[in-house]
Design a protein with these regions (language model features):
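Sec-dependent N-terminal signal peptides
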Residues: 2-12
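Short hydrophobic/aromatic-rich motifs at helix boundaries and adjacent loops
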Residues: 1, 28-32, 182
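Short, solvent-exposed linear motifs at loop/edge-of-secondary-structure regions
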Residues: 6, 52-59, 63-65, 215, ...
Length: 350
């Protein structure tokens, strides 16, 4: 059973950095969602741009429908960034050839093969250790730009098909506190249970082929799926006081050649009276070497939730996989985040 635990903690970095392109998206979203002019302007006053805001862009942003306080904040940003380099031009997108979808028979075969793979996934994994790095971000304004709350390093051991987590440090400081007692949002189920539950017969998920995609250089089938609430085992626990098991939907990526699952996305259909109004998860798998053998193992999970206007985002990376053994050691220095290209989907190729 995959469980999300939501315990909101209000700790936020003082200043947000963003590019002009990110600023454009932020303003567009703010206008569409009718955020108060005062709130948007206040947020921009705590924002530092990474490149120059040009006069033509300033005029473009005004034309979007920015309020007078936001316009004044944008003018201040234009003055403050006049010595910064201009943003690089957006790359030109070239449309590739249209790739026909597989036949209905092939689509059915792919799902059946993926189901067999998912049901036997945990049994096929070796005993191992790895480092789990969780970077947690929050946005109490609800405007969509996050400040980092903390970085949690944990030792994750997988032995006899069971996961065990031990927190090693928080923000580089050694601690001996269980994950569930750290507060904030946490998640579990990356090592097989999320995937298996989706394909369980009693879950009765409906799968529909959607499109092709390229992920980490390989072509994937992308299916959309739907799980009705009565068949769901996916749970959200709110502050250990309330719990809900909603229906959910999302996408599942299946590598064309190996028929292994490489990504699962999930969006919960949460009852309107539950404190957490939105919950989304994306889980990526990649081929990883353990003791000279390749295994498809979790690479990164991203969890997003919303309570009222409070937004939470967790980025969970799984690093330094090692074969489980009495003499196995891992250095728990926090690595640099994975590059965006590690989980970036690209247009389908031939």
């Amino acid at each position: 059973m995959r469980v999300l635990v939501f315990l909101f903690a209000l700790t936020l970095a003082a200043q947000t950095r963003m590019s002009v392109e990110q600023l454009r998206g932020f303003l567009k979203s703010s206008v569409e969602l009718h955020h108060p002019d005062k709130s948007v302007a206040g947020y921009l006053k705590k924002t530092k741009l990474t490149n120059r805001l040009e006069p033509r862009q300033f005029e473009e942003f005004i034309a979007m429908g920015a309020g007078p306080l936001t316009v004044e904040a944008l003018r201040d940003l234009m003055v403050a960034t006049k010595e910064l380099p201009a943003a690089a031009p957006a790359p030109v997108k070239v449309a590739g050839p249209v790739i026909p979808p597989p036949s209905a028979e092939e689509q059915k075969r792919v799902i059946n093969e993926a189901r067999d793979y998912a049901m036997g996934y945990s049994k096929g994994l070796p005993d191992f250790l790895c480092m789990q790095v969780t970077r947690r971000y929050i946005d109490p304004s609800g405007l969509g730009f996050y400040g980092q709350q903390d970085v949690i390093n944990a030792r994750l051991s997988y032995f006899d098909q069971k996961e065990d987590y031990k927190v090693v440090s928080v923000n580089g400081r050694s601690v001996d506190t269980p994950m569930q007692r750290l507060g904030g949002a946490t998640s579990s189920g990356e090592f097989g249970s999320m995937m298996k539950e989706l394909f369980e017969p009693n879950t009765a998920a409906r799968f529909d082929w959607l499109r092709w995609a390229t992920l980490r250089g390989k072509r994937n089938h992308v299916f959309q799926y739907f799980v009705a609430q009565p068949n769901s085992h996916w749970t959200i626990n709110y502050q250990d006081r309330q719990q809900v098991t909603p229906g959910y939907r999302g996408l599942i990526y299946v590598e064309r050649d190996s028929l292994q699952v490489t990504r699962i996305t999930l969006e919960a259909d949460i009852p309107v009276d539950f404190p957490v109004q939105e919950a989304q998860t994306t889980l990526d798998y990649d081929m990883t070497d353990i003791n000279g053998r390749g295994f498809m193992l979790p690479l990164k999970a991203e969890v997003r939730m919303r309570e009222g206007k409070h937004l939470v985002k967790n980025e969970v990376e799984f690093r330094m996989y090692r074969k489980f053994g009495a003499d196995t050691t891992i250095t728990f220095d926090t690595p640099e985040p994975l590059p965006a290209t590690a989980t970036q989907e690209t247009p389908p190729n031939n």
